């Protein structure tokens, strides 16, 4: 709830607590978890808390930098599904930064491919994955989907 205080979103303790409770439930956590210490949470739960901390401020745009890279495959899937659900519910736009093309394919509509800090390709997910134009994009796709 610190973000609520800093950004003065709610002066009322009752509204403050209601907003916290709503976002905790939205990200798939239990209300009794609010009294736990940080070391008592799993990696997936910590990621859900990070998402809740961002969303409680009611942004239109959320920048996610490698949000699933430290998570195992099962938890990655859960977090991606959660992000898609929250995107729809809260009408969010994401800038999703990742090296994992399988995750990018699952969550993105538009994709920007960068090499050495320079944009080499920007197109729809369909075009990037089905007919990439830049050789670097082609190389990335080939190496990512060899399995």
Model-assigned labels for residue ranges:
Residues 56-60:
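A short, proline-enriched helix->beta-strand linker immediately N-terminal to the Walker B motif
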Residues 104-106:
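A short, surface-exposed alpha-helical micro-motif characterized by mixed small hydrophobic
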Residues 51, 79:
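Hydrophobic anchor residue at the start of the ABC signature
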